[in-house]
Amino acid sequence: MIVVEHLTKHYGDFVAVNDLSFEIQDGRVYGFLGPNGAGKSTTMNIMTGCLSPTSGTVRIDGHDILKEPEAAKRLIGYLPERPPLYTSETPAEYLQFVGEAKGVKGPELQRQMDEVIRLTGIDQVKDRLISTLSKGYCQRVGIAQALLGAPKVIILDEPTVGLDPIQIIEIRDLIRELGKTHTVIFSSHILSEVQSICEQVLIISKGSLVAFDEPENLEKLFTQSGSIVVRTRAAADTVDSILKRVPGLSEWASTAQADGCLSVSIRAETQDSYEISRRLFFAFSESGEAILELTVKRANLEDVFLELTEEQEHSATGTQDNALGQTHEEASSDECEVIVP
């Protein structure tokens, strides 16, 4: 559905997006995850035709966003980080304007307006001035305009930023509902949000794609999945002697507890936690010692995110680039209004 190849965006010497390549398939919900200033908004603005790349291509259902902008943009509904709303209008007036700008008219426009108003839950406020609406309702109106024109792909940039907890839950539920009939891509830096909604996760850091997979697969791949904590009454030197004889262990650290037990955190070279656990029980038993408790630590999306983004930070040139990246990220997110073919 969407093919991004070798996408790069420079602002002078600063690289906001660095050689991004990925493919988005039909009918799934994708989370675009990264810290502030990572390049998420810049990438989304390029994908939607609001910003030109320095190099690289974006194709929407086979249509190049630069060479065939009208055909490509007809397939996209976009909500920028700052919703492009006209606050002197009512939601109904605003949606009529957007629909006509997208080439939808007459009975079909009214049908689509009725549908998106129902879907986004703004029927009760459709005749109030947008300037009087809460942040949550403004986000809903922004999503409603993205849905006009019957696009196949919905792209949402930080759709829950600035909302209260109830509004966040409502927008998340709306995204799940949209995912039943559309391909949805939304950006966030909130890990729990991405984990609870998305079927696929793209993690971007310093403008580079560092991971792209299902959340569950990412969790399985990273370090904490090979971490085991053992609780025992054996002495620390005895534990060291036992663990040195267990194959497949890379490192361990012992901590004395108030009840006289020893807590031992063990990092394994293999991710086969069952096999490592079996070896540990056997080794302790053979030495006449007992394992009172054994816990396998499973990675979550937060572990994956921190490890990947910290690796990128170590290669960064310094905090000045971070600030510059945020400045360009914010600037690029302001460059787009309503997408009109």
Language-model features, listed with the residues they occupy:
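Conserved protein kinase catalytic domain
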Residues: 73, 117, 172, 219, ...
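ABC transporter nucleotide-binding domain
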Residues: 173-269
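A generic structural signal for secondary-structure junctions
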Residues: 77, 103, 142, 202, ...
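ABC transporter nucleotide-binding domains
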Residues: 2-4, 9-206, 210-211
